[in-house]
Design a protein with these regions (language model features):
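Ribonuclease/tRNase effector modules and their secretory precursors
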Residues: 1-102
Length: 102
């Protein structure tokens, strides 16, 4: 099992983590633009502008925050824990059920 790279608590009281191995996959294969943006991802998770629940998978939540750009961190929830599926810069908030807003 890969070591935890970082872990943060969200406003939904979910402890979200990402492993070092998955982080490398995310920044080399999925979204290289996110390299070096760990603190931004933590901020999006800890203090999002809004959180939406996926219409397709009710265990998947999209955390949004506008900083220099609009960031989205996609998290799979499992009880009180969660793990990052992906993180990216987007131009707009996607559809989904609004479950939390600041």
């Amino acid at each position: 099992m890969s070591e935890i790279y970082f872990s943060v608590k969200t406003p939904l009281n979910i402890e979200v983590r990402i492993t070092a191995q998955y982080w490398q996959y995310l920044i080399t294969i999925k979204h290289p633009i996110m390299k070096g943006r760990e603190e931004i991802i933590k901020s999006v998770l800890q203090m999002p502008d809004e959180i939406r629940q996926s219409k397709i998978d009710t265990n998947v939540f999209l955390y949004y925050k506008r900083l220099d750009k609009l960031y989205c961190v996609v998290v799979k929830h499992a009880d009180v824990e969660g793990f990052i599926i992906t993180a990216y810069i987007t131009d707009k908030v996607k559809e989904g059920v609004l479950v939390w807003t600041k």
